[in-house]
């Protein structure tokens, strides 16, 4: 099965592009993803990225709600108002736009984080801190990490 796993940090080039890790590009190719759906994560200061199926999953959740309900409107605000479509260039690079930089605080490096069915873009130190916090919370709760 193709899953986005692990993490890797890559430097942004002078033109504002970053190479997507080859393992992540392989998953995108296996899934035949041509266009990336990118949205501002609901919990973390990260950009979540997947194929159009990720957007479709959220839209099915909205469609199951009363279209005038606060839940449906809030979800639409997040996934439509906080989302964009992007493409990788021929060399497997992603343009690190103001949309990405402004939400994440990314400047010269990007940490790619696998999240099974999608991946995320993080400012490297923010990822390290969030991972340490998650590990600490699990340890306090007596759960194995």
From Swiss-Prot:
Its main location: cytoplasm. Residues 7-54, 83-126 form the SpoVT-AbrB domain. It comes from the Bacteria. It is found in: Cytoplasm, Nucleoid. Disulfide bonds: none annotated. The keyword Membrane does not apply. One of its GO terms (cellular component) is nucleoid. The keyword Lyase does not apply. Transmembrane segments: none annotated. One of its GO terms (biological process) is negative regulation of DNA-templated transcription initiation. This is Transcriptional regulator MraZ. The gene is mraZ.
């Amino acid at each position: 099965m193709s899953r986005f796993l692990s993490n890797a940090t890559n430097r942004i080039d002078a033109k504002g592009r970053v190479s997507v890790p080859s393992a992540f590009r392989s998953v995108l190719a296996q899934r035949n993803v041509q266009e990336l759906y990118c949205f501002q994560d609901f919990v973390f200061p990260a950009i979540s990225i997947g194929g159009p199926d990720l957007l479709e999953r959220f839209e099915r959740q909205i469609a199951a709600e009363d279209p005038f309900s606060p839940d449906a409107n809030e979800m639409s605000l997040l996934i439509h108002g906080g989302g964009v479509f992007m493409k990788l260039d021929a060399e497997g690079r992603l343009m690190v736009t103001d949309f990405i930089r402004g939400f994440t605080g990314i400047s010269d490096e990007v940490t790619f984080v696998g999240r099974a069915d999608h991946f995320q873009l993080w400012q490297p130190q923010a990822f390290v801190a969030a991972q340490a916090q998650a590990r600490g919370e699990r340890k306090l709760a007596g759960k194995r990490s």
